[in-house]
Amino acid sequence: MKIDITDYNHADEILNPQLWKEIEETLLKMPLHVKASDQASKVGSLIFDPVGTNQYIKDELVPKHWKNNIPIPKRFDFLGTDIDFGKRDTLVEVQFSNYPFLLNNTVRSELFHKSNMDIDEEGMKVAIIITKGHMFPASNSSLYYEQAQNQLNSLAEYNVFDVPIRLVGLIEDFETDIDIVSTTYADKRYSRTITKRDTVKGKVIDTNTPNTRRRKRGTIVTY
């Protein structure tokens, strides 16, 4: 895949280059993970697969000594149960859920930062939040990168948060052959049990025209 990034509060100056390299390399070599939708308006069409994407990232980072599912201290557990990944002073959240969850990630990252909470035997200094681009068809109301940019830009304009954040968007080029991992689950919406998984070629078709006023998501096809 390809990535786009937006930094807040000088994250580019604070982020450890080696830790970022491990994240970047993982994302750049990752294939696009898809599954068939079961939502009424797009039954059977291919959409972004958050479960497969999360698992790929986990399988790549844990062997590099990134901690996974780091428990949130009890005094802060009103904001959730755990952090996706962490290493040294860096926190990573993979956010493909509904768009309001970005604010939760931001607030708790701010709290962890200001309280100097230990991530991996070091106080937390910077957060990386990974999202998907708007170009990918996805489950209704799930967060996308451009939306996250708008939210964080507005918050940053009024100095709502001080924690350094690197926002990452997963993207691809339209109309270009790419590697795709297509997965079928035991239950299309909630299951993590894989019944079939294929690695194929495919592309994301641009469904926009020069006259399109509001950018539409692409269509994913495999062959």
UniProtKB/Swiss-Prot annotation:
Q: What class of enzyme is it?
A: hydrolase
Keyword field contains Aminoacyl-tRNA synthetase: no
Q: Which residues form the signal peptide?
A: none
Q: Which residues bind Mg(2+)?
A: 84, 94
Q: What's the superkingdom here?
A: Bacteria
Q: Which reaction does it catalyse?
A: Endonucleolytic cleavage of DNA to give specific double-stranded fragments with terminal 5'-phosphates
Required cofactor names: Mg(2+)
EC numbers listed for it are 3.1.21.4
An annotated GO BP: DNA restriction-modification system
Keyword check for Hydrolase, yes or no.
yes
Return one GO MF term. magnesium ion binding
Cofactor: how bound: Binds 1 Mg(2+) ion per subunit.
Query: Keywords, A to Z?
Result: Endonuclease, Hydrolase, Magnesium, Metal-binding, Nuclease, Restriction system
The UniProt subunit note reads as follows: Homodimer.
Q: What is this protein called?
A: Type II restriction enzyme BglII
Which gene holds the coding sequence for this protein?
bglIIR
